[in-house]
């Protein structure tokens, strides 16, 4: 169900600068999970998808990495091989240093050499700041890739 919910939002676009969304229905749903204008929204998008699919969303935070930490504290240990519907979490890397900022998305396909995601607040280059909900092909690269370092996955229950 998570994958289907995520796919239903493909193409949703923001108003430049994280000011809101072109679809007022989508904006209303995002505000219900905590989004407000000016905020990065990848974690809010992932929370919305998991909420609509009936998953536990209590550990979610506006921060991708904090969300990962919260799920681990709640007993949902991170894994290195995801299932469809899993959360995938990255941390930003600047000048070789891990930052507290990051990015989060939903895995829709998991293969041996790559995985496919649907992510909010992404761009055509795959970075953490973007303009829309988009599908991405990602590698299991545990080093920095496009300014992001893969941290792990939280599988759904």
Q: Which sequence ranges carry the predicted segments?
A:
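Low-complexity, Gly/Ser/Thr/Pro-rich intrinsically disordered linker/tail segments
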Residues: 138-157
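Residues that form generic nucleotide/phosphate-binding pockets
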Residues: 5-9, 29, 67-74, 156
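N-terminal capping segments
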Residues: 1-55
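Tryptophan-centered motif/residue detector
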Residues: 41, 48, 76, 90-92, ...
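A short macromolecule-binding patch
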Residues: 126-137
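Helix N-terminus capping/helix-initiation residues
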Residues: 20-24, 63, 139-141
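Intrinsically disordered, low-complexity boundary segments flanking structured domains
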Residues: 75-78, 135-141
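...with weaker cross-activation on analogous glycine-rich loops/strands in unrelated enzymes
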Residues: 3, 55-127
